Amino acid sequence: MRGGVNMASIKDVAQKAGVGVGTVSRVLNNSGYVSDETREKIEEAMKNLQYTPNELARNLYRKKSGIIAVLVPTVEIPFFAELVHNIEAELYNEGFKIMLGNTDKAHNAELEYLDMLNRHIVDGVITGVHSLDVEEYKKIKKPIVAFDRYLGENIPVVAVDHKEGGRLAAEILLKNGCKKIVHFRGSTAVESPYHERHFEFARIMKEQGVECFDYELAWNKFDLEYYKYAVKDLFDRLDEWEFDGIFGTDLVAIECMNEVIRRHKKVPKDVKCVAYDGTYITQIVEPSVTSIVQPIKELAQEAARLICELVNGKTYKNEKVTLGVSVRKGRTTMK
């Protein structure tokens, strides 16, 4: 007895079940043959003794930690917060815990998590960050799933149909009579599926003869203060350009709405607005924001499925899972 708690050992279990320690070990690690009768005796002994297996020792034996690292720039962004929440729930159902890495404020954090993968501290990595050179990922032949980024032919990618998302956003603004549109686009410094929505949006606007001002956001910047700076910077540049439509990710779109109001104009009377991602924040602001919605729960399910399959030995080549997007109407595009 230690501190009033019965600290039973594997030897105690073996003695109570009338078997050798090696037999108990095979049951714990699910390795080698053990008859059903003997297995039942061991499980009953464990129950009676309230024996809890040493998870660390068992993982060392199996060379598995039961942990998946999930890397995002920051959970301060609602999209990443919802994604992590859903990935954690999916992996928990598969017997895994997550190790969360917010990488935007930590130099070399992404590389350090990959080193942990190499050293078996984590079993796999799901990454949605854009800070590390692709060549670093190509060196690693371990379970990795990429979210919205191309990292190499052996690393599966999970994304949405961004081209369709760009088309839907363009159609909404055009149907609402917008003639001069501000388009916030992600950085072109990394190769990512999300570029497809910007290309399609810009293509349609050009095809329709609509003026469109593209503002490229800085690489690897995912915080509200930067978005506030970027929006004010753009509005100052376009002070004399009477734009009437805005397209950007949720936080950018909402900050644009705030800036429109600060400049004594109204949404949607003077400026229409469409957001991309469709997280909960687009529904709790006033007016509610018309959004192109990414199916975050389904994206998380696919990422979790792929990483579990990779951990269990499956391999992929040039695998890309693409999910559809949808439109959720808000009051920012009402006529």
Residue ranges and their predicted role:
Residues 1-65, 79, 334-335:
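N-terminal helix-turn-helix DNA-binding module of bacterial transcription factors
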Residues 8, 47-85, 94-96, 104-106, ...:
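N-terminal helix-turn-helix/winged-helix DNA-binding helices
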Residues 73-82, 100-108, 158-168, 184-233, ...:
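Hinge/beta->alpha junction and helix N-cap segments in small-molecule ligand-binding domains
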Residues 89-134:
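Central regulatory/effector-binding core of bacterial HTH transcription factors
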Residues 128-168, 188, 277-289:
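Flexible loop/hinge segments that line or gate small-molecule binding clefts
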Residues 180, 213-214, 267-272:
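Short acidic capping loops at alpha-helix termini that bridge into adjacent secondary structure
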Residues 236-247, 251-335:
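Flexible loop/turn connectors
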